[in-house]
Amino acid sequence: MRVLLACLLVCALVVSDSDGSNEVHKESGESNCGCLNGGKCVTYKYFSNIQRCSCPKKFQGEHCEIDTSKTCYQGNGHSYRGKANRDLSGRPCLAWDSPTVLLKMYHAHRSDAIQLGLGKHNYCRNPDNQRRPWCYVQIGLKQFVQFCMVQDCSVGKSPSSPREKEEFQCGQKALRPRFKIVGGQVTNAENQPWFAAIYRRHRGGSITYLCGGSLISPCWVVSATHCFIDHPKKENYIVYLGQSRLNSDTRGEMQFEVEKLILHEDYSAESLAHHNDIALLKIRTSRGQCAQPSRSIQTICLPPEHEDAHSRTRCEITGFGKENPSDYRYSDELKMTFVSLVSHEVCQQPHYYGAEVTDKMLCAADPQWETDSCQGDSGGPLVCTIQGRLTLTGIVSWGRDCAMKYKPGVYTRVSKFLPWINTHTRGEINLVL
């Protein structure tokens, strides 16, 4: 009873606010505490003049930095200060001040942690301007950056002013490439809006980039069968559209599950060549939607069934592939380069590939043998102009090394597989230019 009375007396003293020398707490300048969002710095006399932020309604945290009213994020979520704390798979986020996170680049002990929204909590944030809020998640023995289960405020809302609905127009680009680098050009999704980045899921939840692909309709991506032959289950893969950098968010990108994975029934691989190397992926978001058109997401036209680009036609190839086969990592940035089609007669010569090249394949190379598709570009697009429109002429399939003289890249000839595409998509794709 005495202990209880003593506790009650102390509590009464702490919460009272008398005048003069009996004052328990007082407001100080905000600079002493770093209070945000209208919080007031309060000094508690009976607790060794400890200063704390007194937060207004809807805010909490050491500096009033947490907005409890926020249930969605604006833009890319850089300013999001809500309380979402799980990734898209439902895994809990690690606290920003946990020992393992303190070893990462972004953590609660950074000098700019308050400005970035990082602190003694595990709420999702976007300190580095990725596509959406994220957090570190423990998967097995490692920590991974994972996007968070928090809603985009713009989803489901009508724009304040009416605007014309965007529609898919195959082969249309928003931008032209600009920055030259060795072996090609750094590009972005707005310049290659049909490019699909295909990732493979691993045990434990991590994902790694696998192959490229091309969006040929809102629900369908075409790629190469050899990318999936060792792991043919659709659940193993995630597809991103509108992505300009590997393992990093690009504003406007979309993530998809694979609803169907269709590998060519007659696919075969010899010592080097891949035959019938084509695959289809039917894609859906977690909400069951297909792709939506934007500046960074667009379909590529399919070729006429009986017409291909002529030899020496200048075409584009795109991907995150390696500069050299011996490179340890893929390119961090999406790249494109130009190659020219090599005639069938030339590519079948003995010092090229001989009889390994069939009429269902195309060859293309840089005339100076300096740029080429390489490992990691598999499944990606070879885009040529046919009848004045950018058209998916080939799919990156195989070749010997990268940019090796007399060994051009070999591509699946898309025009030879239009009936197969039509059969498996059940006529969902318009095959007429």
Swiss-Prot record:
Modified positions (Phosphoserine) in chain numbering: 160
GO BP, one annotated term: response to hypoxia
Keywords for this protein: Disulfide bond, EGF-like domain, Hydrolase, Kringle, Phosphoprotein, Plasminogen activation, Protease, Secreted, Serine protease, Signal, Zymogen
Gene Ontology CC terms: cell surface; extracellular space; protein complex involved in cell-matrix adhesion; serine protease inhibitor complex; serine-type endopeptidase complex
GO MF annotation terms: serine-type endopeptidase activity
Reaction catalysed by this enzyme: Specific cleavage of Arg-|-Val bond in plasminogen to form plasmin
Signal peptide bounds: 1-20
Name this polypeptide is given: Urokinase-type plasminogen activator
Annotated organism of origin: Bos taurus (Bovine)
Lineage, uppermost ranks: Eukaryota, Metazoa, Chordata, Craniata, Vertebrata
